[in-house]
Amino acid sequence: MYKELALALGLGTVVALVFLKKRKSVLKAHDGWWGVGACHQGPEDDSIRPFKVETTSEEIEDLHRRLDQTRSFPSLEDSQFNYGFNSKYLEKVVSYWRNDFNWRKQVDKLNKYPHFKTKIEGIDIHYVHVKPKSLAEGTRAVPLMMVHGWPGSFYEFYGIIPLLTEPSSPDDITFEIICPSIPGYGFSEAPHKKGFDGVCAAHIFNKLMKRLGFNQYYVQGGDWGSLITTNMAQLEPNAVKGLHINFAPPGKAGLLMMLSILFGRRFPKLFGFTEHDVKRLFPTMEKLVVDAIRETGYMHIQSTKPDTAGRGLNDSPVGLAAYILEKFSTWTDPEFKNLEDGGLERKFSLDDLLTNVMIYWTSKSIISSMRFYKENFSKGLNQPHAKLPVYVPSGVASFPNELMHSPKSWVTQKYHKLKTYTPMARGGHFAAMEEPQLLAEDVQSFVKIVEKRKKK
């Protein structure tokens, strides 16, 4: 047993050394055209236009009419959220949405920060741009792009923005925040051509930062945002000074990873596993296979026929809310599925949850947001970006209730300049919205380390 293990580790070390000696590669991307019809000839319109979220009485009346006409269907007895969104609690959500939720007030809240649009590669890109109100003499704001995922939106960052642009400690870094909407999400125009994946989004977001005058900047993301920001770093390693993510799913399974799966439970220290790593990874079949199948049904639908399922969600606000909010329950804490209310109001307010739903509803973006899965997965799992390491300074905030867990030893196989890996005290998938203070502190710690090392 021990001889076999030693031999396997020796082979793994040789493979790793050969891999690391390869010349550093940069991900390649080409300009695309995602607008309607043929590519526009001539220079691209690079104007930046102020934008405001708006609503009308007709829009609100249409919503109320649809809420009034919803058809309820009873959940099974004693099923809680194990079959999906519990119908009894959904009735409470719909009642609050219809009678108490003030969309006009939430629109004003959305507009508390400046919004803009600019056209890149044929489509309008929406983003929120927040500059610090004041800066101490001799200091500068550090540009940071924060990218959301599905089924979130730029609104996820409204709680963390003031913590980063107006830090309470004079020792903290003051940030200038840019929060774009992924094309096809919220108020960014949806691509009109097939093939728009994470690399394409990353290429556009790097262009956006350059258009805003930033030659170097930091990026942060969770869910799809982690893929997009990772791709941004792979595309422009000289522009992206640092990458911070709070979602680091396991990468391509190499020999060392396979060995750690086979022997890590018995020899955790040999593979750098902590007690939490062992708890999240083993037994392997249950944690890495069964749990994944149980929670990824939506992914199979959206990766194959997004337009079919999306049509019903685009027509029914109640269906849309159930589909989105069920993820805010289970992905925040898997144990919440055993609660009648899904634990939703333990971590979030209904106003915040419904505001995120309303961004999808009013922008009619649920179908185009779901297509992003098909565009990424239909190209296969062996894409260049999946095989290419990240060479820019990176930081990972590992939240205990995240959907998928990657031990530090796995993360370093992808992110070769990992500066921080923080096991967080609490929190799940929607970290910026659920635990803005914890995430802000980790971003601060990471950027301070990178900035300090840059000065040496």
Model-derived features: positions:
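N-terminal membrane-anchoring alpha-helices
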Residues: M1-G35
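Conserved hydrolase catalytic core segment
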Residues: Y2-E4, L17-K24, L163-T174, L212-P268, ...
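Alpha/beta-hydrolase
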Residues: T13-V18, H40-K52, T56-E59, A239-Y360
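Non-catalytic accessory segments flanking enzyme active sites
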Residues: E58-K133, D352, K364, S368-N382
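Glycine-rich "HGGG/HGxG" loop immediately N-terminal to the catalytic nucleophile
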Residues: W103-K105, I182-F196, T230, G254
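Conserved HGGG/HGGXW glycine-rich cap/lid loop of the alpha/beta-hydrolase fold
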Residues: L135-F187, V447
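Alpha/beta-hydrolase active-site loop
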Residues: K193-R211
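C-terminal subdomain of alpha/beta-hydrolase-fold enzymes, centered on the catalytic histidine
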Residues: I301-K456
